[in-house]
Amino acid sequence: MIISSWNVNSVRARIENIKEYIKKFSPDILMMQEIKTPNETYPYDDFKLLNYENYVFGQKSYNGVAIVSKKKLINTQNDIFKDKNKQSRIIQAEVKYKKKIINLIN
């Protein structure tokens, strides 16, 4: 299993670079930080066309995180820590791999 992490510094500004990376390296899971977009403007369709599902905790400015995966994401949550400033900085999901559960924290 290939798991990649990338501080993209704006998913919408870098979507072509991200798609190129996915096509070249085909990671099973890509965890992105600083996506800098709310959920409503996140490019879900770009990832769906590449057969990846998304779990997104979006926010403008320097925040926002996402996990994209070839495998079904289960037990997702974005409230691991109660952040009084409501900043989108951490998400959790699990995937099944070879009869095991892999816990992802991004």
Which residue stretches match the model-derived regions?
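N-terminal, active-site-proximal structural segment of metallo-dependent hydrolase catalytic domains
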Residues: 1-53, 62-65
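Structured beta-strand-rich core segments of catalytic domains in phosphoester-bond hydrolases
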Residues: 35-38, 42-106
